[in-house]
Regions:
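Mid-domain Rossmann-like dinucleotide-binding core that forms the NAD(H)/NADP(H) cofactor-binding site
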Residues: 6, 47-121
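C-terminal hydrophobic helical "lid"/dimerization subdomain
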Residues: 196-245
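Short amphipathic alpha-helix with an adjacent loop that forms part of the alpha/beta core around
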Residues: 122-133
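Glycine-rich phosphate-binding loop and adjacent beta-alpha segment
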Residues: 11-13, 145-212, 245
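Short, glycine/polar-rich helix-capping loops at beta-to-alpha or helix-loop-helix junctions
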Residues: 22, 100-107, 171-176
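NAD(P)H dinucleotide-binding glycine-rich loop of Rossmann-like/cofactor-binding domains
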Residues: 10-75
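A glycine-/small-residue-rich N-terminal strand-loop-strand element
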Residues: 1-13
Length: 245
């Protein structure tokens, strides 16, 4: 790196598996620091690293998303869900997004969702009303507690990527692989703890090519961390919460 280079850090477990997120300075492995070739300002850039890496990796590295795909984004109002909708819409996909709150429907449509379903835990029949043969791809952000239902939304040869655990259930002891995965369909997953330069470069190229702007809900100063957490835990944020250091 050179002086004045714009760089980002992507640490995966920072703030969860280990401390270090709320500091003015942090010592990081060089493999977790990346050059950011972008015109985004620092507030926008702060919303990119892990969220875009997770969404992009899930869509293009795992689901092999293409322009003619139909995709269900289950957990559409999560930070990763919002970015996934933006990325999928940028290449021309048809998108079904889910939310638990009716007041989020218009927001999801504004960022690119073609259809929005209120998620009560069982949505497969509602998805089949829109796509009788099922969708070609599913991004599962809610988790293992609804994966059986999400599998039922897949078309033949469809792929489901398990990325999120918004439902707080990491593992399922009742998951019957043979019975749950439809014949000719595929289950994969994405884990964000292994960032690499190739994908990060692709992400910034994609952002520039399609003029994608990160959706920012609110910006706080570092002294307002508690307020940022309260907003996050209220589930009322529409987009990323950014903290200025």
């Amino acid at each position: 790196f050179k002086k004045d280079d714009k760089v980002i850090a992507l640490m995966g477990g920072m703030g969860r598996s280990f401390d270090g997120g709320y500091q003015e300075y942090a010592l990081l492995p060089t493999k977790n620091v990346f050059y950011a070739k972008t015109n985004l300002d620092w507030i926008e850039l702060g919303a990119v690293p892990e969220t875009f890496f997770t969404a992009y990796g899930s869509l293009f590295e795992c689901l092999n998303l293409e322009a003619n795909d139909s995709i269900l984004v289950r957990g559409g109002t999560s930070a990763t869900g919002i970015v996934a909708i933006q990325l999928a819409k940028s290449i021309g996909c048809k998108i079904i997004a889910t939310t638990r709150k009716e007041e989020k429907i218009e927001f999801l449509k504004e960022i690119g969702a073609d259809f929005v379903i209120i998620d009560n835990g069982e949505i497969s029949k509602k998805v089949k009303e829109i796509y009788p043969k099922g969708v070609s791809k599913v991004l599962e952000l809610v988790g293992t507690n609804v994966i059986d239902d999400s599998m039922k939304t897949l078309a033949h040869k469809g792929i489901l990527c398990l990325t999120g655990i918004l439902g707080s259930k990491v593992a399922s002891s009742n998951f019957d692989i043979i019975k749950t995965i439809p014949n000719g369909c595929y289950l994969t997953s994405f884990f964000s703890n292994y960032p690499n330069k190739e994908i990060m470069d692709k992400i910034f190229n994609h952002i520039e090519k399609y003029n994608i702007k990160p959706v920012i809900s609110k910006v706080f100063n570092i002294g307002e961390i508690s307020k940022a957490h309260l907003l996050m835990e209220s589930n009322n944020a529409n987009g990323k919460i950014v903290v200025l250091v």
